[in-house]
Amino acid sequence: MQSYWFGDSEDGRCSPFSGDANAIVSRILSLPVQMDTFTPPDWQQAVSCGFCSNRADYLARLQAVCIAGSERSVREHYSGKDAELLQMVRTLDEIDTVINLLSERAADWYMVRHPAFSRKYRRTPANILVRTIREKSRGALGRVAGEIEQLADTRTALAKEVSARANDVLPNTSALIGGLVAARLMANAGGLLPLSRLPASAIQVLGARTALFAHLKTHTPSPKHGIIFQHRRVHNAPRDIRGRVARVLAGKLAIAARLDYFRGVAVPEFLEPAQERIDTAGKSEAK
């Protein structure tokens, strides 16, 4: 028996498939295809099978099936458990950018009003600087500073949600490097599936695109780490062994990402020795 998207043919007889476009898509996805014996059908076969009345009808139904298949693919893509986390991380990054830009602009504006406000005050923490501007300014500048503070509160709340969501979507990766860093790593890769496909060497420099292209173009020293630099074991490591620590961490993260994608639950038998290896990475070389 030869099965096509519009019906089944056997011994010269054809039975048309009855169902809407979505049912046909499900049928297509379930059909086994043997390419060595498969013969592409034409519209005349579909007419002979009783599936459609003429070529125009065939093309119209084929178009409906293609649209239904595309819609299903889009739904599956955006219904993935990492889809919302991806948007949350990107929103968090945008909020960070907006806060930094507005804080700089507010400080410049305040300096115009108060020339004695020298740059040494700009070395203070941003939250203290913005609060000072809000308390000592009236009118629009004070309101802008207030909006920055509210945006900072929103940013803090969103960061907590991102971390909590990452613990659910990336349980193993989050256990190794923390929810927020794990989420940023996944977002930079483009999703959980792309992250799970990356080798350890790519994960190690993920987020260091500028430095990597500078290395390829101008032969500057290659980057030793990207986003994973935010992990305490990497940024606290001595400079001469930091690259080795980053390699160990990236190797464990490559495995963790695959476990997150294919299993979706924390794997203690992996996490315990992996965490121990990360904690001791570089110690022997440092002696």
Question: Which stretches of residues belong to each language-model region?
Answer:
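Extended, structured, electrostatic nucleic-acid-contact surfaces
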Residues: V89, T156-A175, A187-P194, S201-A202, ...
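N-terminal basic/disordered segments at the start of proteins
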Residues: M1-S18
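Acidic, carboxylate-rich catalytic segments that either coordinate divalent cations
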Residues: V245-K287
